[in-house]
Amino acid sequence: MRFAFFGIFWLQIFGSILFLLGFFPHKNDSTGKAMSNQFSPPAVIDQVVFVMVDALRADFVFSKSHNMPFTQSLLYNSTHGIGFSAFARSPTVTMPRLKALTTGTIPGFLDVLLNIAESDTGSSIEAQDSWVYQLNSFNKKIEFYGDDTWLKLFPSAFSKFEGTTSFFVSDYTEVDNNVTRNFDHALPSSLSHSWDALILHYLGVDHIGHLYGPSSPLLNIKLLEIDTIISRIYKYLQEYDEKTNTHSLIVLCGDHGMNEVGNHGGSSSGETTAALSLLFPSNELSHINKPILNMDDNPYSILERVEQVDVVPTICLLLGIPIPKGNMGKVLSPVTELWKDTKTAKMAALSNLFQLSLLKNPSLTTSELSTQFQDSDLNDIRLALENLQSQMVAQSSSYSLDRMLVAISILGACSILSLILFRNLYNYKELLAFAPFVVQNIIIVFSSSFIEEEHVIWYFAAVSLSLLQLLNPKTRLAGSLQLFCLSIIKRWNQTGQKYSDLRDIVDDFIAPSTFMKTILCVTSAFMPAIRSPSPINFLSSMFIAFYKLMPIISKHLNELPIIASFDYTFFVRIIWSLLLISFLSKPTFKQLRCQLSLFILLLTRLENMGLYLLYDIWQRTMPEEGTLASVMYYVAEQVAFFSLGNSNSLATVDLSQAYTGLDSYNIFAVGILLFTSVFAGALWWCLHQPKRMMDRSVKTFWIMSSISLTFLCISCFIMRHHLFVWSVFSPKLLYNASWASMYFLAKCLISTIMVRLR
């Protein structure tokens, strides 16, 4: 049976991968390069500085409540700057957004995985047309300093460069200082720089968002730093343009925004609304940056809304280089007045229209387009650009239907084979108990609203099971304690989409209170050691509590040398060593459970550590065997996943815990730590099931996850043209694939080892 089971498992893994490849096809980006056409206008800009600030939400630049006085003075009190709220299409992570900002294309959702993997070969787009390539083809020199993702995308494009690591999110100071320190060379006082294009990518804003959220006072300090940098660049170029009689452009933009927690990757208005500003030190524009009056649907979209990819044809036309072949952007209307006569401005818009038209009709000639629009004015061409762009964006998604259908057949067969294989595992009563959850899992995946608010369904299921215990006088006290715990667990973190911005227990009682954080941290850290007492376990618990509270301690005692020079990475490695030594010295069931529980606590946010105290009370009051116990432990794993603040959106993935104990980026180490931190709650319940239930629990989880994944794939196939396919169904598919593969493997491994220990 074991060999048959693992055969089915690997067949399901194959089916899952096949479906993902069909649903998230890695786009075969155009390898052709654009050439100048008869509409190409002369250049009106001689050099450009492209300043990318990671996670720069539109309101960070345009709202008076944020600290960018110099930039705002250019936008609101001068004629030298224009600003836009740029729509960054999902997925809102760095690599796909950089592809969009350089090629004008709309990247696929699979780029999320490449963004995390940082594969050099998988990431490079040098074979694809972009404004970076076009500048190189015109023998323009480009210098780059900042996020090394650019170096992976364009390995040989820059004459001078220095990269910084983007994934080490715990640093938000040095990572930006390492960019600015190149200014003495890039912006010399002699005004004799050697570049035609300078690209700078700052990461500090993004890292502060991940660590502390957009409401942190650190954000305004960082924004002022960015504003000072923009001021320095602007004044340098102003002086340079005056001396050399040239014209320069500064592009200040974000690759994406961030939500109210500080994360990104999803499709909320905060994540998809990025800043885009064009600053002209020696040119003036008549455009007035008027705030949008009705911002009810998007409070972050302060100025005129445009597609983020619109910056690509704008840069190309201003610099007099061909627009990338696969571009789907349209030139920003206000800049066309830089061509002083209307005829040339019209030619610039026609050049963009011709490039977009070739995507739809490759056989189109310039003469045909010229004839079609010979009597049209500039506004007519702009309208045609808008309509054509809308059509091309709508057609940008492609699927491999054959792969998807074959994969669904394989996954369906795996589900049926699993039911046949374990048909003797359950009696009629047990099948009846699990049936509602099978039906529930099927219903959830066919509704975008249910997927977004799935946590509500699992909370309801947990409460219902606890209420059942109130019917029996013997379990009435246990049921009451469970309901008490669940009432707090449900309100600990607001998650999902609809009510995620509402205040929760963390916001109101834990985050503002040093006392509450300290009490909950210390109590939670010592709970595993109390369950499995030994001197080394208590020492590990003490070290974990000290490590978690160190940021609080350092605020008050930072003047002490031992605090100021505290090495977090080395200290975490000491904790890891203690956990390993403790288990090897006494390899028992309780000891392994204790060490893994402590490891999970180490990778949990300080504000969430108190949840494990509630889990502990809930678990101790559960029945130790029987159908109800099996169902309750299955539901508890789901509840724990959501109660820690997770959801079916990639935006809730907390990268900050994935670097615990690391001093550099390593994909395997980060992957393991990230997986553990995301599924920490579910893993805790896996560890704390009664030993005699573990094998049965693994098989139950397998059947449930297999059926759920099969029907989710069917749902994604049916809903592939749904409005929320990328923002709702796609992240859910990635999560479910992780549940059915990585989490199941971890659960299987833990159960196999623990069952064999005494």
From Swiss-Prot:
Record-linked InterPro entries: Alkaline_phosphatase_core_sf, Phosphodiest/P_Trfase, PIG-G_N, PIGG/GPI7, PIGG/GPI7_C
EC number in record: 2.-.-.-
Residues carrying sugar: N28, N77, N178, N493
Entry's transmembrane regions: 405-425, 431-451, 455-472, 533-553, 561-581, 598-618, 667-687, 698-718, 733-753
Pathway membership, UniProt: Glycolipid biosynthesis; glycosylphosphatidylinositol-anchor biosynthesis
UniProt-recorded Gene Ontology molecular function terms: CP2 mannose-ethanolamine phosphotransferase activity
Keywords for the protein's UniProt record, in alphabetical order: Endoplasmic reticulum, Glycoprotein, GPI-anchor biosynthesis, Membrane, Transferase, Transmembrane, Transmembrane helix
Annotated disulfide bonds: none
Compartment(s) of residence: Endoplasmic reticulum membrane
Membrane topology note: Multi-pass membrane protein
Pfam families: Phosphodiest, PIGO_PIGG
GO cellular component labels: endoplasmic reticulum; endoplasmic reticulum membrane
GO biological process, any: GPI anchor biosynthetic process
Record's function text: Ethanolamine phosphate transferase involved in glycosylphosphatidylinositol-anchor biosynthesis. Transfers ethanolamine phosphate to the GPI second mannose.
Record family assignment: Belongs to the PIGG/PIGN/PIGO family. PIGG subfamily.
Name of the protein: GPI ethanolamine phosphate transferase 2
Annotated source species: Schizosaccharomyces pombe (strain 972 / ATCC 24843) (Fission yeast)
